[in-house]
Amino acid sequence: MTIQYESEFRTRLLAGGAEQKLLDILLHRLKESGLLKTHRRQRTDSTHVLGAIRTLNRLETLGEGMRVALDSLAVVAPDWLATNIQPDWFDRYGRRVENYRLPKLDSEREALGSTIGADGLALLDAIYDPTAPQWLRQIPGVETLRQIWVQQFYAPEPDVQVKWRTVKDMPPSTIAIHSPHDVEAHYSSKRSIDWVGYKVHMTEICDEDSPRFITNVHTTLSTITDEQAVEPIHSRLEEKDFLPDEHLLDAGYPTAENLVNSKTQYNIEIIGPVRSDPSWQTKAQQGFDSSNFQIDWDNEKVTCPQGHQSTKWLLGLDVSEKPVIRVRFNGVTCRNCPVRSSCTKSKTEPRELTLLPQVQHIALQTRRQTQKTPEWKATYNQRAGIESTHSLMFTALGTTSISLHRFKENSLDAGFHCLCA
């Protein structure tokens, strides 16, 4: 089954958030009828959704970017384009740019890329000329062309041929444009799957005495991590008045911050495994990891397994700008320690620890212990059933092959497919 609907109608649906409203109405009707008796325990998992675009290489992206911009100008500013277009552009961009029509030799492909780059710069120079109408710059196809050229080429220099960026100077996947036909469809990789498109998180009830009703569909860019989706999902469930007591999630979702915030803000217990301590001691299963140190939070002191106290307690931020505490021990004491090799691999520096804020640290350490118990594992095993819902969406409704052209339309289509499920 594939959902099709006319463009203007689709626009009205998007503006009104119709897919969420319909799902909310359905859930409350099910509740009123007695079919939905409880939503105490729910589970969520994400899957990839392909964008409705061809996979383009760099040369195709450049050519298509130029073609889209020219096609847009031909519709909204035909007179202006007629006076600024170059004769060669009709041959180069008159039809879809496809790899089988492009040169095969690397030298010829590089030369064509430079030619397309020069064409794009000439068009942008004309559009940004003071005498050109300023509204031309707001045309989506033109802005997409500008962004692609910034990402693919170095800044132009006078009397120097336009130069492609090297791979190391290319933008990260979070902003890289892979097709001018959908600038929000980004490349992402998860486990063994690589795709260009989006991500959808489906939440369903998994209480033993309740049917498996889907309660929420949350669509994100493909580059948004699962852990970043936890708070928006809980916020949406709160708006629906469908918050669970327990939320079963796989290892991609739980973090110390999510464990704490979910409990304090929504009174939800996340049932999901947290990542193990990344230290070499934990990986080698020998030596002293952070769990072997005693922390005195009130006095801001840490005691090592040998009974020595830390000398520095510094507040800071990690690479994600999240608050952490950096603890350091005395250099002389550490260098003379008889079990130094079990504590640090540094030949001269003392042992250092990076701790999370107290509440998060305790929540993380507690979960690492409880997730080893048979009782916890038995509860968590119920999370696996969400994959059958994904299978239904894939095989029966074709979620991964919906015609998705923009992020909001992705959300709309995924929401309606959820209702059909």
Where would I find each of the regions flagged by the language model?
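Anion-binding and metal-coordination hotspots
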Residues: 3-421
